[in-house]
A protein has these predicted regions:
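Non-catalytic interface/targeting segments
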Residues: 2-78, 85, 105, 111-128
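Short alpha-helix boundary/capping motifs
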Residues: 73, 93-94
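Structural motif
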Residues: 94-95, 114
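Conserved functional loop/turn residues at catalytic and ligand-binding sites
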Residues: 87, 95, 108
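Short, glycine/polar-rich helix-capping loops at beta-to-alpha or helix-loop-helix junctions
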Residues: 96-101
Length: 128
């Protein structure tokens, strides 16, 4: 989902509409916000343009299984890699643990917490 070349936020560039904002939310199979950010099985990466979801990609991350695997810190490193690869600018979640909050702060990534219900609605609320 990485965009080629420089992005013109919310504007057409080379006949492509680039997002105003890229957000990530943990999502259940029925489209609700999964209350577990760091242990989510699936997340959605959403491109928001002019207050509307222009693209929605759900990705199996299996963080529930991977959370306790590997050396200390490897799970946070995995999440950082995912967020950077997908150029995420805001994390939308119900709750995030203290360690993950610190990690997001070091990345200067804001977290919109307390999200419940429809994952798409939560993304739009966070983007507004």
């Amino acid at each position: 989902m990485a965009t080629p070349g420089p992005r013109s936020r919310g504007r057409r560039h080379d006949e492509r509409l680039y997002p105003d904002m890229i957000l990530c939310v943990p999502v259940t199979s029925d489209g609700q916000v999964d209350p577990r950010w760091g242990r989510a099985d699936r997340v959605a990466v959403a491109d928001v343009v002019d207050g509307e979801i222009a693209a929605w990609q759900e990705i199996e991350v299996s963080w529930s299984r991977l959370h306790d695997e590997g050396a200390p810190g490897s799970h946070h490193a995995r999440v950082v890699r995912f967020l950077r690869e997908h150029q995420v600018e805001i994390v939308v979640a119900n709750h995030i643990g203290d360690g993950m909050v610190r990690m997001l702060a070091t990345m200067s990534l804001p977290a919109h917490l307390g999200a419940v219900g429809s994952a798409r609605a939560a993304v739009l609320e966070a983007a507004s």
